[in-house]
Amino acid sequence: MGCCTGRCSLICLCALQLVSALERQIFDFLGFQWAPILGNFLHIIVVILGLFGTIQYRPRYIMVYTVWTALWVTWNVFIICFYLEVGGLSKDTDLMTFNISVHRSWWREHGPGCVRRVLPPSAHGMMDDYTYVSVTGCIVDFQYLEVIHSAVQILLSLVGFVYACYVISISMEEEDTYSCDLQVCKHLFIQMLQIIE
């Protein structure tokens, strides 16, 4: 097999998905975004499973990866809708943190060009509340950075889905050929035994 096969391409794509998911996982941990952390963790596990299935010629593992990519695309479309506030969703809710904390996206305060300034608390507030943090000068708003992350994940998943389907179809054809070869060998072996007798 040459290096430009669908299998090699899927291996490279899975490796790229792992790097991308790990990068996203780090920034979600920094922002205490528990729902995306859980999703990224599951994604990393399934991509490793798909990578293993591709390397070891295990089409069932690749099928699990294929089903997961459809779910992963759905999750990332939801994240895009969440940050763009489509369909009644609001990026200012605590949905991504499971309503555990008031943390938001790490990019909200640390995006490119952002200047973070802590304002003095009022008499009624507490210092750890995010309403006392002022962020100015951002080159790109945080919600667009999150949308870009999700769009990259969708693109990688869609390409991965196509390659995974291709590798599964090739694997199934090879299994059919192999089982046919076994039947031919069995038939020839029986004929040889009959000739010897």
UniProtKB/Swiss-Prot annotation:
Location within or outside the cell: Cell membrane
Annotated TM spans: 2-22, 35-55, 62-82, 152-172
GO cellular component, as recorded: plasma membrane
Keywords in alphabetical order: Cell membrane, Membrane, Transmembrane, Transmembrane helix
InterPro entries, per the entry: Na/K-Atpase_Interacting
GO term, biological process aspect, one: regulation of sodium ion transport
Protein's membrane topology: Multi-pass membrane protein
Domain of life: Eukaryota
Keyword Transit peptide found: no
SUBUNIT field: Interacts with ATP1B1.
PANTHER family for the chain: SODIUM_POTASSIUM-TRANSPORTING ATPASE SUBUNIT BETA-1-INTERACTING PROTEIN 3, T-CELL LYMPHOMA BREAKPOINT-ASSOCIATED TARGET 1-RELATED
Family, per entry: Belongs to the NKAIN family.
Name listed for the protein in its UniProt record: Sodium/potassium-transporting ATPase subunit beta-1-interacting protein 3
Organism of provenance: Homo sapiens (Human)
Gene: NKAIN3
